[in-house]
Each structure stands twice: as C-alpha cells, then as structure tokens.
A protein has these predicted regions:
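N-terminal export signals
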Residues: 6-23
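A conserved short beta-strand
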Residues: 206-217
Length: 310
C-alpha cells in the first residue's frame, strides 16, 4: 500500500516551498511522493513472454502474483501502489541545461524508507552539483520481485515520463515542455534491472537517453544491456557491481568484446558519449547505493557528467 504519511508530508512540503519563476533558480529543495496515473502498478496484463497472466492466483476475492523468489504476493498489498518520488534540488535552474535522473529501486523497497532515507538517492543527486531533477517510481512494494509491470508495455514508460514532466512543472513553475525535452539518465539498483532492461528494449525515450548507470544490478538481461551499448555508441554505460551480479557483468563484457567494444575497468574521469565502464567492488549488496567502489557512488558518477552544472 502507498506510504500515505510520506505522500501527505510531501504534498504539505511542496505547498510550503516557493516555486521558481520562469528562468529563476529554485530557492529551496522540493521532495514529494505523489500518485501517478501511469504508474508501473497496478498491472493486469500478461507476463512479458506471453506465457500467462501476471496475476495468476485468486483466493477469497483477491488476486495475486507468484514471484519466483518471494512466493505469492497479493495485488492489494504489493502491486497497488501508484506512488512516484519527485525531487528538485535547491538551486535547480530550469533555464539552464538540465537532466532528469530516473531511479529504479531494488527488491524489498519503498520510496521513503529506502530510496530517500536509507540509500540517500535524493541527497546524492543534490550533492552531485548536477542541474537535475529526480524521478523514482514505486514498483512491487516491499517485495522480493523485480517485475516491471506496465513498463513491460512498449510506449508506457514514455507516457510515464510525460506525466512526470507535468508533475515537475507544477513543482517548479517551469513549463512541462522543458522537462519533456530534457535528456534522461537511467539509474537502476539490484532488481531495478528488469524495468531498466524493458525500457531499453522497448526504445522508450531513446532519443533523450544520455546514458545508463547500474548499481549491482545485472542479474539477468545481460544481452539486452550489451545490445543497447552496441547500438548507442553516443551514450554512456556504467555498471558498478559486487559478487552478486558479477556473472551478469562478465557476460556483458564478453558480448561487448565479441563486437570489438572495449569496456574499461577503471572509474571514468568523465561520463561522455561512448563511455563504457564495468567497475568491480567487494562492497556489500544491501548498502551498494551508498558504498560501492567508493562512497556515495551515484553522487560521484553524476558529478562526472559535464555540461549540466547547477
């Protein structure tokens, strides 16, 4: 179920923060969790391979999904949260070159408890110095399930981003068209690999995608990531990983090598067109978003993206 306290707190905070006028820097940071119409869940469609319905269990009037890792999860508890986190750092200027950072969380997560508080994603984006806004949808709520839901459907993520642009426009006072035109950096942690792979495979917002950052996330779909890298040589791709996703990253490296594409093992000095880096780490998986090959890896990597200083 949605974290209603977080939603209410966010809405009250938004109302209290002064919006930026056209071409003005935001005087205070804004972070809010709001319901979206184009959210990943609820999802009443089929599994992506077409083998059957996503909701494959019924009992006492309830519908549920059988997760390979978590067993049966019920729609009303796990797959009904329409929440999306929208965050705008202090000093954001919609009149300057800017990017949208989209963050896909991992298993067992909720937006406020994990993305905001534990993993400090909002704080890392702000501390990066990037003139960026953050968008993070809720997937399966607090569950061992990596399902992408509606993001499996071609074109759905593009619709989600249109709604995000409208929400960001309301928060900042800038026009939605500005956010609709901004380049996108896609970040996925752990189980966020599945929706990330779906977005890349479907080609949603492909013309706006500056690059991809994966944080211990290649548990499957290595072929999709490698194919995307090969077909988008003007974008960047960085995957930092520990032991849990080492085999998936090794598969990406092998697939790239077979196509004559070199993947660096060193942290990139800059994130730019053609950057491909696979960075190993012995850091623990559960804290990987805050400590990987170095502390606060998302902050550090976003800080390597030039041309979008706040």
């Amino acid at each position: 179920m949605p974290d209603r306290r977080a939603i209410v707190t966010g809405l009250l905070a938004t109302a209290a923060f002064p919006m930026a006028s056209q071409g003005a820097r935001l005087r205070k940071a804004i972070s809010t969790i709001v319901p979206f119409k184009t959210s990943p869940f609820p999802y009443r469609g089929k599994l992506p391979d077409g083998s059957g319905p996503f909701l494959d269990v019924t009992a006492n009037g309830r519908r549920g999904h059988t997760s390979p890792r978590g067993g049966i999860y019920w729609e009303d508890e796990t797959y009904s949260d329409r929440s999306t986190l929208l965050a705008v750092p202090r000093g954001f200027d919609p009149a300057r070159p800017a990017v949208i950072v989209v963050f896909f969380h991992g298993n067992g997560a909720t937006l406020q408890r994990d993305v905001v508080d534990r993993q400090r994603v909002v704080a890392q984006v702000e501390a990066s110095g990037l003139n960026a806004v953050l968008v993070a949808p809720q997937f399966a709520s607090n569950a061992q399930d990596s399902s992408a839901g509606n993001f499996w459907t071609p074109g759905y993520f593009a619709r989600f981003m249109t709604e995000a642009a409208q929400g960001l426009a309301k928060l900042t006072g800038a026009k939605a068209a500005k956010f609709d035109a901004m380049p996108v950096v896609l970040v996925a942690y752990s189980g966020g690999y599945n929706p990330a792979a779906s977005v890349l495979r479907n080609g949603d917002v492909s013309g706006r995608l500056l690059g991809v950052i994966l944080l211990d996330a290649v548990f499957d779909e290595a072929d999709i990531f490698a194919d995307w890298i090969a077909r988008h040589r003007k974008s960047f791709f960085v995957s930092a990983y520990g032991q849990p996703s080492a085999s998936g990253n090794a598969e990406i490296r092998q697939l790239l090598t077979s196509q004559g594409i070199d993947a660096s093992s060193d942290p990139p000095r800059r994130l730019e067109a053609g950057t491909v880096a696979l960075l190993t780490s012995d850091a623990a998986h559960d804290s990987f978003v805050t400590r990987a090959f170095l502390g606060n890896p998302l902050q550090w990597l976003l800080g390597r993206l030039h041309g979008f200083a706040r």
